[in-house]
């Protein structure tokens, strides 16, 4: 009897599947069961509407505490919302709203601790041009892609892995640190560790400072590799001294930064550097769940003739396999080809592994996240939602973009972040001094970085990532840089006179302030006689001594020049007719909302809250 041929069974996919609906969370902002629930920072106006309270009541809460620089557009801090809620007898709770439009940027995986395993650290090498970044990466990779950094451009997939002591390390291999900032501007926190390359014979240079600014702004730990120590004139101690002003010092100098000295060309110090990276990785315990559908970040992308859109991605969670359906922002597709940095075909990739993939319907952008799902239908729907989000974002005005440059610092004060570029160091110091002497209540400045030389693409990318304004002094700005700034919604201000820059900066700072509101008295009336009404309470027969009394206006009751109650004019009558206002030297009947203990000779003062000019 002939046996029927058996087919090879498709292996069972053991990865835990992502159920999109379980990660979506629509949050209704408002009061529920005595708890005020919100998702994002709220202005006073928004908060008042959500808790069904008049804006004036919220503003008066701050006025009573001596805080006058607030208005209906003021963004409330967490502490202020809590304080207001307690004042209103409410508890409060902040929750995150996750929709299909923002899922890729906000998904929080519910991995169990026992499912997490150690993953390789992801490292970016940064530093000044010609200080040896590419040579160091080549030395680590044990190849020689280029011997002249100034003319050489990295040609492989943008990342690779090396093994040291049976431990893997992933290096992001880019021509500079622009990609690092580009990804950060998109909210992609990919890098675990930055290796800062400094030439021992050259010391700290402008791009070294830029790299430090980028790393610190991203809150990423730094390892300093002092390169070219084989050259005459190389001085390790001088580099340590120069870099100490950036709060980067070795343990022997009282700091906690790891310093390694060596020579990339001679492959000296490489093992020590890799050991330092693994030590830092062990301290920080980088982990991920490999037994799940894939999630990761794009580091490079391009259109490859014959293969279509390609993307180099690094897996952050789960395992990516050939045949997986993935969504990368507005792009989606099925992974048809997956290769490592050497062009070898792979069938799967685990956390921290960099791979190049093909099979997408469009070219994604660096910094975009990808997510693997069970079906093509699911990834297409998610991609369509993301496209809708992009269309909405295109309608944001430049004014809205500018408003985002204002942030609240740790002291609750509004802060305008600046990047300053000047022709010479003397001008730079004068500008920094002039800015430090600007004193405007309720708003301050923070210099993200200040350096000499023309504005570069890196400056624009840092400004975009940190929501900063760029100030240019005695420098020309190329059309290329202006176009880039416009596309990234970065504001560049150019000056030749310092006092003019200070004047404009003061106006900007005042413009960043929320309009200040103050109380303005409309009129006063003295109570002469009282009537009691069974339905509406006490009616105060009054005489308007100044200004006018207006229905629904805010008011306060004064007795012996002391404010005893604040409310509003609930009802206003002239003789037998209900009216909206009563002028000076007229008699009227007044009902103060929710207040019946008014007495003869009390003063009813009517006022409004008006905007005050700040300059």
Swiss-Prot record:
Q: Where are the transmembrane segments?
A: none
Q: Which Gene Ontology CC terms are recorded?
A: cytosol
- Any Pfam family the entry gives: EF-G_D2
Q: Which cysteine-cysteine pairs are annotated as disulfide bonds in the entry?
A: none
Compartment(s) of residence: Cytoplasm
Q: Which GO terms describe its molecular function?
A: GTP binding; GTPase activity; translation initiation factor activity
Domain of life, per lineage:
Bacteria
Q: Where is this region: G3?
A: 173-176
- Classify the main location: cytoplasm
Q: Where is this region: G2?
A: 152-156
Q: Which UniProt keywords apply?
A: Cytoplasm, GTP-binding, Initiation factor, Nucleotide-binding, Protein biosynthesis
Identify the residues that the record assigns to the tr-type G domain, covering every copy: 118-285
Q: Where is this region: G5?
A: 263-265
Q: Which InterPro entries match?
A: EF-G-like_DII, IF2_II, IF2_N, P-loop_NTPase, Small_GTP-bd, T_Tr_GTP-bd_dom, TF_IF2_bacterial-like, TIF_IF2
**Which residues lie within the region annotated G4?**
227-230
Region G1: start-end pairs: 127-134
Checking HAMAP family in the record gives: IF_2_B
Please identify the protein, giving its name as recorded.
Answer: Translation initiation factor IF-2
Which source organism does the UniProt entry give? Mycoplasmoides gallisepticum (strain R(low / passage 15 / clone 2))
> What gene codes for this chain?
infB
